[in-house]
Amino acid sequence: MSQEAILEKVRSIVAEQLSVDAGEVKPESNFQNDLGADSLDTVELVMALEEAFDIEIPDEAAEGITTVGDAVKYIEDKQA
């Protein structure tokens, strides 16, 4: 899956999970600061990404995923 395809899928999931417009979801968007996610939202978002991409994101890795771009890079690395 290309980086662009991953970004589009992540953008769609983030927009749905956080009830924000997909246009607001940019690679540099921070889940908490820019998109208004709280800690529970973040956990649910990680679970949704795991399910959508059929990957496992350990807690240690999830703590380092703070932006949309971080999520895309992590998923891209897991699929390589």
Swiss-Prot record:
Residues 4-79 form the Carrier domain. 4'-phosphopantetheine is transferred from CoA to a specific serine of apo-ACP by AcpS. This modification is essential for activity because fatty acids are bound in thioester linkage to the sulfhydryl of the prosthetic group. The keyword Phosphoprotein applies. InterPro entries: ACP, ACP-like_sf, PKS_PP-bd, PP-bd_ACP, Ppantetheine_attach_site. It comes from the Bacteria. SMART domains: PKS_PP. One of its GO terms (molecular function) is phosphopantetheine binding. Pathway: Lipid metabolism; fatty acid biosynthesis. It is found in: Cytoplasm. One of its GO terms (biological process) is lipid A biosynthetic process. GO terms for cellular component: cytosol; membrane. Carrier of the growing fatty acid chain in fatty acid biosynthesis. HAMAP family: Acyl_carrier. This is Acyl carrier protein. It comes from Synechococcus sp. (strain WH7803). The lineage of its organism: Bacteria, Bacillati, Cyanobacteriota, Cyanophyceae, Synechococcales. The gene is acpP.
